């Protein structure tokens, strides 16, 4: 349970680490848009996205294996979607048994798309500490203050939630052991039995979360925390040349993909015209 | 049931370089039936890892040595952990955090229903009643209450009842007195002695509290860096300056006082229980503060 590598921060002092969290979030979103823009079967677009991730990983000095590990957590999901495409796609000509050529291409397309998105997302969380991430989101949501949306509180809730994930994992471990010692069985029986067996774990976990929330609120109160109004920052987010470079690169990626799409679209138009 | 560990080893994350951590290093120990056995040592010395082996919460690693609890061979793949856990009760720190059921009755009966599937409702009621009265709670008063409505001390009692209701032969307690006030602590330790007299045969206590160990344990093992560096009676352990220094533990109050009074020539020795120590001191004082 301890090896949750998706979303764990990898401390370093690299170019990417030093970038403004707001810019990194925007770049990550733009990158995902780019991945989705790659239209069907034009794998050159995916190659461009992969190149972008590899480049970013090299610059960020995060070991490649560490980034690849994040894919491990969703491998089941990827394989499942690919299998669905393989066996239930009826278009195209049959290559082998029930598998069609369109099915094969679609499966490859889905695998590439999900993997690229997860790689990009995990690179963001690997190079941005949870605190910076929360600050970045707060910064990006700032315009919502105009409609009285509690942006600062929202960001605070998020960073607290992130902070408590490891604590809750430890706690779950302890409670599972305590109930196992009382004969609880989590490993046998059908799915309903197993779900029911989790009640003696979930209820104590819920109660201890409330207790922790209470304690945390007291601790914040005793340090005179009073919300966004009086709060100043130790680390101010600042948009620098690094962020400009990042934004330019990702903009280049999007333009390139749109161009490729247009190029292919024109090509196929020309083909159709030629056939006519 | 005897607990016998021979060359027991355990490494956390053995395959990951940098993260792997050897928690147990050639542990050899024999805990006899009827003992109150103390397991002492600093945080991270391997105490908890060791006791969690005893009821199979942590499984013996391949090539990790031998561990036998009564007739159960824990290195055997076919070991029946469920029936083992019925015989080895385990209580963790802050046991009240494991409460979950709607009523005290349901919570205490949880272990019973898990361990004996075909037990009758009457028998469950009888056993729960017995367990609750053993820990000093009034069955009729608390059985239908929500465990979350009870006071802290009562919650802990309910949690203990939920462990001893299965009538374990060995009871393992991890820091049993943590977070209790002095009165609660005293009452709890008296309860332990009562349990040992007529309920469970062997009690194994993991603790930082040397006073508790000196007072109640028949024998103890000192853990340091995953190794057992000494096994013996509290008297033997706390008299040996080497062990105390190596393990980084405190002396129990009685041992420290005995040491001081010995150097001043007021008493000769004591076995470090409060009763024996005060007796020796009274005799010394009656003789005008000098060794007779």
Feature-to-residue mapping (PLM):
Chain B
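The feature captures the beta-strand-to-loop junction immediately N-terminal to the Walker
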Residues: 40-42
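Helix-to-loop junction immediately C-terminal to a conserved catalytic motif
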Residues: 55
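ABC ATPase NBD Q-loop/coupling interface
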Residues: 66-83
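Conserved ABC ATPase signature
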Residues: 146-150, 154
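Conserved catalytic motifs of ABC-family nucleotide-binding domains
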Residues: 167
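Catalytic Walker B motif of ABC-type/P-loop ATPase nucleotide-binding domains
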Residues: 171-174
């Amino acid at each position: 349970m301890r090896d949750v590598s998706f979303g764990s921060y990898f401390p370093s002092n690299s170019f990417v680490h030093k970038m403004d969290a707001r810019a990194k979030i925007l770049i990550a979103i733009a990158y995902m848009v780019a991945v989705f823009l790659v239209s069907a079967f034009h794998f050159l677009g995916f190659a461009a996205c992969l190149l972008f991730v590899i480049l970013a990983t090299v610059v960020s000095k995060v070991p490649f294996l560490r980034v690849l590990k994040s894919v491990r957590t969703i491998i089941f999901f990827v394989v499942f979607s690919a299998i669905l495409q393989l066996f239930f796609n009826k278009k195209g000509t049959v290559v082998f048994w029930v598998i069609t050529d369109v099915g094969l291409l679609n499966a490859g397309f889905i695998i590439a798309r999900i993997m690229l998105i997860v790689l990009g997302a995990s690179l963001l969380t690997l190079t941005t500490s949870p605190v910076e991430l929360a600050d970045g989101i707060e910064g990006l949501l700032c315009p919502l203050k105009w409609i009285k949306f509690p942006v600062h509180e929202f960001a605070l809730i998020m960073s607290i939630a992130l902070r408590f994930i490891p604590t809750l994992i430890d706690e779950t471990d302890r409670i599972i052991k305590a109930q196992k010692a009382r004969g609880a069985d989590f490993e046998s029986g059908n799915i309903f039995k197993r779900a029911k067996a989790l009640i003696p774990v979930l209820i104590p976990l819920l109660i201890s979360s409330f207790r922790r929330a209470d304690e945390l609120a007291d601790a914040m109160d005793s340090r005179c925390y009073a919300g966004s109004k009086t709060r100043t920052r130790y680390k101010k987010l600042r948009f620098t040349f690094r962020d400009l470079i990042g934004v330019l690169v990702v903009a280049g990626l999007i333009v390139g993909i749109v161009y490729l799409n247009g190029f292919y679209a024109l090509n196929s138009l020309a083909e159709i015209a030629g056939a006519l | 049931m005897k607990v016998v560990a021979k060359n027991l080893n355990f490494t956390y994350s053995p395959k990951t370089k940098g993260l792997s951590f050897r928690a147990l290093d050639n542990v050899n120990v024999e805990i006899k039936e009827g003992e109150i056995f103390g397991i002492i040592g600093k945080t991270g010395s391997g105490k908890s890892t060791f006791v969690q082996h005893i009821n199979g919460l942590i499984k013996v690693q391949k090539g990790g040595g031998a561990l036998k609890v009564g007739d159960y061979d824990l290195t055997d793949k076919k070991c029946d952990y469920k029936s083992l856990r019925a015989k080895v009760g385990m209580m963790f720190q802050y046991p009240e955090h494991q409460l979950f059921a709607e009523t005290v009755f349901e919570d205490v009966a949880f272990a019973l229903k898990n361990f004996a599937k075909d037990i009758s409702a009457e028998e469950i009621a009888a056993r729960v009643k017995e367990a609750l009265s053993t820990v000093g709670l009034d069955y009729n008063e608390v059985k239908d209450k929500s465990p979350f409505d009870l006071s802290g001390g009562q919650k802990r009692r309910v949690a203990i009842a939920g462990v001893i209701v299965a009538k374990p032969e060995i009871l393992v307690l991890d820091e049993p007195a943590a977070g209790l006030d002095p009165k609660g602590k005293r009452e709890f330790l008296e309860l332990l002695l009562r349990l040992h007299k007529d309920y469970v045969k062997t009690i194994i206590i993991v603790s930082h509290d040397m006073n508790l160990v000196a007072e109640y344990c028949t024998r103890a093992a000192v853990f340091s860096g995953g190794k057992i560096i000494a096994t013996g009676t509290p008297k033997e352990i706390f008299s040996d300056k080497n062990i105390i220094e190596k393990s980084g533990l405190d002396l129990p109050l009685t041992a420290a006082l005995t040491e001081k009074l010995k150097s001043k020539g007021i008493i000769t020795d004591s076995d470090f229980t409060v009763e024996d120590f005060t007796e020796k001191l009274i005799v010394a004082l009656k003789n005008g503060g000098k060794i007779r």
